[in-house]
Amino acid sequence: MPQKTKNTPMMEQYLSIKAQYKDAFLFYRLGDFYELFYEDAINAAQILELTLTSRNRNADDPIPMCGVPYHAAQGYIDTLIEQGYKVAICEQVEDPKTTKGMVKREVVQLVTPGTVMNSKGLEAKDNNYLTAVLTDGNQFGFAYVDLSTGELKTAVLADEEGVLNEASALQTKEMVLGSGIPESLKENLSLRLNIIFSTQETVEENAEFSFLTNELINPLEIEITGKLLSYLSVTQKRSLSHIQKAVEYQPDHFLKMDHYSKFNLELSQSIRTGQKKGTLLWLLDETKTAMGGRLLKQWLDRPLIQERQIKARQEMVQSLLNAYFERLDLQAALTNVYDLERLAGRVAFGSVNGRDLIQLRTSLEQVPTIRQLIVGINQGEWDDLLVDLNPVEDLVALIATAINEEAPLQITEGKVIKDGYNDQLDEYRDAMRNGKQWLAELEAKERQETGIKNLKIGYNRVFGYFIEITKSNLANLEEGKYERKQTLANAERFITPELKELERLILEAEEKSVELEYQLFLAVREQVKTNIDRLQTLAKTISAVDVLQSFATISERYQYVRPTLRSNTKNLAIVEGRHPVVEKVLGHQEYIPNSIRMNPETDILLITGPNMSGKSTYMRQLALTVVMAQIGCFVPAESAEMPIFDQIFTRIGASDDLIAGQSTFMVEMMEANQALRHATPNSLILFDELGRGTATYDGMALAQAIIEYIHREVQAKTLFSTHYHELTVLDETLKGLKNIHVGAVEKDGEVVFLHKMMEGPADKSYGIHVAKIAGLPSPLLERAATILSALEAEETTIPISVHHEEVSEVHEETEQLSLFKEVSTEELSVIDTLKKMNLLEMTPLDALNMLHQLQKRI
């Protein structure tokens, strides 16, 4: 980089500002362009596909540069933000026309992935959360804000896993790091999320911030919320009056699902595509507003665990189901509601334009209709919500009176304020309209006097108004009649005192009109700004109405039923349940329903059956039904009674975490560990083919030990599918375990999967038949069948040793599975060691390590 002594004053100014924003692209305003220099220019040219040029190109050390027009800059900024970069916008804060010397410039906003306000850079139905975290060495203070909507929440989290789960649920793109954050947490966040880290060293002393945090008690929450607000203040450099008071939330007050469980269940993101399609959110989303869509996703992320709250939502859904025509009218009204949350945010932020205010007015005009429809169906269940569903008639009247229906996007170029709103503005506009008439009359008069029929009066910004005469007609012009102003190739341009006086009147009226109109718009915006709290409350209420009508619409379309949930029961009975997403995907094809019954004494369903027969679908079906029920939606079944679960843990599918360098088996053990450590008797555990990622005996031993541990220690409702058919004898010794299987029949040498759950264990796995369906070569399948027959002829039973107070000691004579006709002395020693191992007193990891050592001896 050149020495400062060689730089021009302008480049000195640039370098001084850039030094304050080293981690951002600096968009430096020069006239009608934003220019980038040095490394910023080189990198931006590549990312944005701009032409890279240089400043002082003939010098020994030319400065790389590129630029974008200021009126088109937003698209380029959005591209950089989407790719995880920050952009510092540096504007001219003095008028170059009235400034002597260097124009003062300063950064007016630092745009980051977590602070996007431009609507084109935001997905309508997705929140854009900026998060912050710090630790005192024992716990973590955590806070998040959506700058576009003003939502601000904070919590104290127990451990790193809690931070990871919250950050993943929020899909945060940027996190402000406080003190003491472990490197392990940063690494895990980077692996799991496309995230950038920012820092904020100080907490601003600010009366506005104190007001936003004055209801918080925990010091960690106060500190981290202060850091988050300070970061917003430093980066945005403007009013944050739309930020709502910080609300403390506790993850334990909602149904908890860790990152793995949400991923496995495909609540909002498809495992295969990473998109919304094919997820529970995709199924349930019949919302008509953007803010309703965002609230639906928030409800999915945090299902309820309070029976009263769940029933309150169910009552409102039921009332909408019972009022078909009112629901249609409600949907029509909601369709005309724009994004009130983000409109309110842009008002406070100072980025709202005339069209935004028209959208705001249109939205507010729907409120009386929405309220009337809700009042008409209300039997008491809507009372709490109706308190906040009030029209804002004064704002509607203000905007209707002041803002032009066809207002342009720019607020500094006129045509924003309606005629009749301001007398002075009307006078200026009359002068402008009369001026045009005066010009037309003057043009006609000059044509008459000169006899030149194609004489015309024109205008440009350099010369103002002028009379233009073609060169072929100059001979007909009286000498000295006009003052020559400009010579063109085919014409001459002239002015007269009368024309200049008209120009003064017209341009003065135009200039004053635009300036007055801008000031009037700002005044209207300030009046709207005083109603931010009312608008945000109204937005939340309409969002809830929208989500509830979406539930009613889906429930009617797919004939869902209202589930019965009780917090004091262990009885689970879902009759003829269906997987909601699979049912939608199948469309008109027949879906085979399945019931799930677990009485208070049954904690574990051990599921066996053929591969591809529907075991995983059955397990996901239960989890999704639970989630739907606990967000207040109806469920796909003939009837449903269930307890209220506090947590869901899943291990479904072979989703190797290859990026993190973790194998299938390691991921299995990590996910199993989460359930075994944190599950309670009120939790739901779903383990699909646990143990398949390692050697057969290792996997079988761990699977059995985990089943026994859940039965004895955890006592949570558990669905455990397995291909280890030897485990089905556990029902003889574990009273809380019940065998079920997926039915299949053989007909003419072919296997037909019934996709129907039946009591008892499966008798075969039908693996060769699945291989046949997959198209493996016939000779290979025939050989596999021969080998299978030979193995089955030699097979005996596996030792099942259950260490439990209620089970008598297993006799030494228990038969054992032998794959070889002769067993070596070393192998007998290993078997003896296995017999003596007390699996129930070992963690899964201890068992795995021991098995690894034994495996080395064979």
UniProtKB/Swiss-Prot annotation:
CDD domains: ABC_MutS1 (cd03284)
Annotated family: Belongs to the DNA mismatch repair MutS family.
UniProt GO BP: mismatch repair
Keyword Cell membrane: no
Record's protein name: DNA mismatch repair protein MutS
Originating gene: mutS
A molecular function (GO) term: damaged DNA binding
UniProt KW keywords: ATP-binding, DNA damage, DNA repair, DNA-binding, Nucleotide-binding
Organism of origin: Enterococcus faecalis (strain ATCC 700802 / V583)
Cited function: This protein is involved in the repair of mismatches in DNA. It is possible that it carries out the mismatch recognition step. This protein has a weak ATPase activity.
Binding site for ATP: 609-616
GO cellular component: cytosol
